[in-house]
Amino acid sequence: MKMFRRLSSVVVIALLMPLILVAMPVPAAQADQLPNPDWVALLSDYEKDYWQAPTDAAHGGKVLDAKTMELDQNLAVAINHKAAEDLDNKSLNAQRKRALVDSDLQAEETMPGALGPVLGAYMSEGLKQGKLNAVADVFSFNVASTYASKRAAMHPRPYLNRAESSFGGTNDLAGLPATLNIKQSPSWLEHVPGYSNLQKNSSYPSGHTTGAYSWGIALAGMIPELAPQIMARTSEAGNNRIVLGVHYPLDIMGGRIGASAQNGQYWHNEFSSSIVPAARQLRGYLTERCQADEHGSTLAACIADVKANGAGGYTNGFLDSVASEPVKDQASAVRVYTARLTYTFPQNTSQSGADFMAPRGAADVLRLAYPELHADQRNAILKATALDSGYPLWQSSDGWQRINWAKALCARVTLDKNGDVSKVETADHVTLTGPSVINAQYANIGKHPASDSAAGENSSVSAGPDLAVLHAAQRPALMVGAGVLVTILGAGATKAVMGKRSEKKRAESSTVRP
């Protein structure tokens, strides 16, 4: 049964701060509001470099870069064919079934499994029972519209006759084949692939991928200890659109860009009013379930007990030419996710080495993972973990294409004596139990505190004993000795006291298009 998503959200009354903090009133401060992202502009490299969109029956679309578009189609066919191996007598296998579930475009079906079988079951039950309404609200509101960006591209899907324009004209494919040998999947139970509904709908960008990444980035930001696995599962949901033969890799990459920008805006504008309540609710609920089943008294202890960041967490043995190793732990999750950032497209080395400037809002997504740090320090983490320039779609994306959420949200960060980020170690190189900061006592030195207001970030109450969101006036009270490692702790037993707030309508429609 699909969960009914209520369009309500909540405000938070402050909890007691952790014992390491000095309890004091937190003055409210209003963050500046970021506008809705211009998704057409962010994704416009596609129309500039690879595909000229059709405009009417007399003017069909045109392939601009045959080499890149050939690789795009060949990858789509290879991934689709690999996923069609070892079918049962109903032409189904485990990978197709998971792809069909993801095709429903329901957060409560796709995202819980990212936490592994134990925590995922808890989350699924909480969503179905209405006990995670604040989380459901984030999944409902925090989605990007792909309507305008699809209209700007109007690129044919891989299972169709690609020579036929959406407007009835003829596309110039620059010698590429009009039809591809796509293996279509049948339905499974109530889960349908939707081939008949997508024929007039542009392949670029993928709306399902946009939805999955909108949810996945938000979930990883709220449970950063499991960010590598959450983002690997999110990338699988995007890849499953290729598995079903309805999208190409560039479509998936475009969806990730759009969803990343959406999260930047949402986390910036709705951090105190929506994100913090949802994170507190989710972490508190998971902790209570863990305690009841004797998996530990904190979320951190539970993650360790059920091995959610290893063999007892999200795993995936579906392989292809891009995801060439199974996901079985944090390190492999980061590697598989990173491979899907570029889908093996070659780098234009003449464009490599461009300085990375974190787009506005990106640092907000790291606020719960690194509550000790200021905006410029979180931007430094994003820069240290970013993809190099020169890969498809990077130039128009305003930096969103280059962000590696699996690395940035779960890293061991070292500060020097000036408070600058001097080292960032990620889960593909070191074993981590969650995001952490070494030498956090230097975080408030120099210009760093001022970067919060410069970024337009608002002050916030605590997200709970394990996710302290520190107001600028409270940061000096963070008592840590030299060289002490400050890391995310397990959720405490203190519960949030929440009140209802009036509903807000978004400035534009948030409908996700397939």
Please place each PLM-identified region on the residue numbering.
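Extended charged low-complexity segments that act as oligomerization/scaffolding linkers
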Residues: 262, 276-296
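C-terminal segment of classical bacterial N-terminal signal peptides
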Residues: 17-28
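Secondary-structure boundary elements
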Residues: 220-229, 266-272, 459-468
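Alpha-helical transmembrane segments that form the membrane-embedded catalytic/substrate-binding core
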Residues: 208-212, 239-279
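Extracellular Ser/Thr-rich, low-complexity/disordered mucin-like segments
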Residues: 451-484
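C-terminal membrane-anchoring or membrane-association module
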Residues: 486-514
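Hydrophobic alpha-helical bundle signature of multipass membrane enzymes
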Residues: 32-243, 277-280, 312-452, 456, ...
